[in-house]
Amino acid sequence: LGYSHQYLYPREIVFARRSMPKCHFVIPAGGVGLRFGGPLPKQFVEVEGLPILMHTLRAIAPYAESITLVLPQDYQKYWQQLCRDRSFDLEHKIVEGGATRFLSVRNAIESLAVDPDALVGVHDAVRPLISGETIEDLLAAAELSGAAIPYLPLTDSIRHLEPLVGSKSVDRTQFVAVQTPQVFHLERLRAAYRQADGGANFTDDASVYEALFDAPIELVVSN
């Protein structure tokens, strides 16, 4: 793994609720939802009377200094109409998305005119069930170490594909499934996105960060 192996971050040492840092959240919502199916991108699919994206924004709002929503131009008016129809007035700004997730996140980060030492968290638009406890742990860990991401242990068996033998089983305890929000010091993540090749095969923000910084990324257990 390219990440720090301190899996269970010690809440009793690093976290005091009264001094919990807040975070500038970036929500890339440009996906077309092909894996999910249906006529709409999955972030706009309704669950319990509201689009999933609204549930996601509500989940992070208590921990947010600001929220930047990244949307393709084609969906900005649609989203604004949804907000009017649902009387959804949670404060956020909209930034136009790029052709890829990488470019969308970079656009949003560049738009943040805030303290470069502030925390920025990048969270998927269709992860509304993130718990407050997980967010709090991530903010505390990132404030100390500079970078923190949530993970879950793998429960499925996994195999490594090999050209000559086809595949081989591997020890799944040596791997974890990474989730969001991924939280960083803004100045460092911004520098990583500026230096990174947008055509590289980055799978998340942590991989962009690692391309520039040889520094541990704290792993925080997710809900």
What are the language-model segments listed below?
Residues 3-9:
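Low-complexity, intrinsically disordered or signal/transmembrane-proximal segments
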Residues 76, 135, 175, 189-190:
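A generic structural signal for short hydrophobic patches within well-formed alpha-helices
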